[in-house]
A protein has these predicted regions:
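N-terminal structured subdomain of primase-like DNA metabolism proteins
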Residues: 1-91
Length: 91
């Protein structure tokens, strides 16, 4: 699986494969309980059209790679790419 293929994976697909489903949807907007920390009120936002996320509880956000870094606690781009490929089932 190359970087462009990984970049094309929808964030919501990775979240689903990790066991996280949206609490609320409205058009291109999805709200989740944060996959990175415990919370009771959904503050984790995904814009499905733009392919970006923002956690209003922490102020962090970005693309699928930064999300992989948050979840896997990795700053390295290749480690993030491997994490995504592993979750998605690619090699």
């Amino acid at each position: 699986m190359d970087i462009e293929m990984i970049r094309g994976i929808p964030i919501e697909e990775i979240l689903s494969r990790l066991g996280h489903e949206p609490v609320r949807r409205h058009g291109d907007e999805c709200w989740y309980l944060s996959p990175c920390r415990e919370e009771r009120t959904p503050s984790f936002h995904v814009n499905t059209r733009k392919g970006v996320w923002h956690d209003f509880g922490t102020g962090h956000g970005g693309d699928i790679f930064t999300l992989a870094g948050e979840i896997s606690e990795s700053d390295g781009f290749m480690a993030q790419a491997r994490f995504i490929a592993g979750v998605y089932g690619g090699t």
